[in-house]
Amino acid sequence: MKIIKIIITKRGAGKYSSLFPFVLILLILVSVFFAGCIGTSDEQTESNATITVIDDLGREVVIPADVKTVALTGAGSARYMVYLQAQDMITGVDITDSMTDPNTETRPYMLAYPEIANLSLLAPIRATINAENALNISPDVILFSTEGAEGGVIADEATAKTGIPVVCFEEYEPSDDFDNFSYNIRLLGQVVGKEERAEEVITFFGDMRDDLIARTPELSMDEKPVVYIGGVSNRGTHGMLSTKPEFVGFTLLSANQKVADVPATNLGTASANIAKEKLLEWDPDIIFVDLGTLNAEGGGALVELKTDPSYQSMTAVINGDIYTVLPDTSAKSNHGTSFANAYFVGTILYPEQFSDIDPIAKADEIYTFLVGEPVFAKLNANTGSLAYQKIDLNTI
């Protein structure tokens, strides 16, 4: 606030000296009035202040300097607001984050903050923006988890219709695309005024990534057991032949997964379906099963391993080396679960190097930092109470 100083000099008594007190009071009132007006003007200027950010699509977006509310669209975009401890700023979500079931939910951020599902609906279709809904919600900024360059077109059209700035970001895995992941966390932190927390999140994932790599023994692939993960979810639940070429528990631990030998052009990275003949040819020594498969048609991967005659000849089935991990793909990747799974896998593949790790305690340490609650027990209950276990197929 600007302060007006008024200096009054008394020059002695005269015929107007009796008016001095009244003049003084008048001048004080005038100064207070103008000071108030100037203060209001300054406050209005501050409230109208803007900054320009460069979003993940390279778009220059002008946003308020002090964002108070955000609406979200795109799969799992609320995840990052929870990571940044900015969940109270969310005023609208798209269809993906507008639904949750406490008895089946596997998204840690939704278990910690189920009330997100009760927020206003920004878009009835994932990764879109309904202009009318946006105007009704009236957020300061819309954050858009895009799925390609076409997201920029959607964002520009929405801003043209509503006047609300839209900041786009892609999802990157901190395990294998750490720089882009870090850029986007910083971007989101800048938008919502959580720059310090953004750096904490980046450091947290970077430290886990480095720790997992450092624990991995220097062995040739021939010295390592052949591993496979089946039952991986991706836009639905699947059976044994659905796998994940970039499963964090294998990539960071340099595991001997034969799926890595398949040309990348033949596989997706989030998930891929392989031929049964290939799996039998690889004959894994150890099989991990994503528990998202429990909801697949026919009972999923565990039932298939038990009942399909062709699987009975696999080394992992014969020796009973079948283990379970939590589903980490629901509304895209839940990075905390990906890393929690990796620590569990480490205790199985390299027990000596991971002898100090209690997988359940480690998982809750991760969840507490990222979503504010130790939600492993809830996740385990929602996946048949089978997480992080060696499975006896006779009990399935």
Residues covered by each model-derived region:
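Extracytoplasmic substrate-binding proteins
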Residues: E60, I154-G236, V317-A387, I391-N394
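Secretory targeting signatures
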Residues: M1-N48
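A short, structured surface patch at a secondary-structure boundary
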Residues: A78-I137, V141, T146-E147, K258-A260, ...
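Solvent-exposed loop/turn segments at secondary-structure junctions
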Residues: G76-R79, T96-M99, V141-I142, E147-G151, ...
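Structural recognition of the beta-strand scaffold that forms the well-ordered cores
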Residues: A71-T73, T91-D94, V141-S145, V166-E170, ...
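His/Asp/Glu-enriched short active-site or ligand-binding loop at hydrolase and phosphoryl-transfer sites
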Residues: E246-G268, N319-L326
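Short helices/loops that flank or line small-molecule/ion binding pockets
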Residues: A65, T128-V141, N273-D283
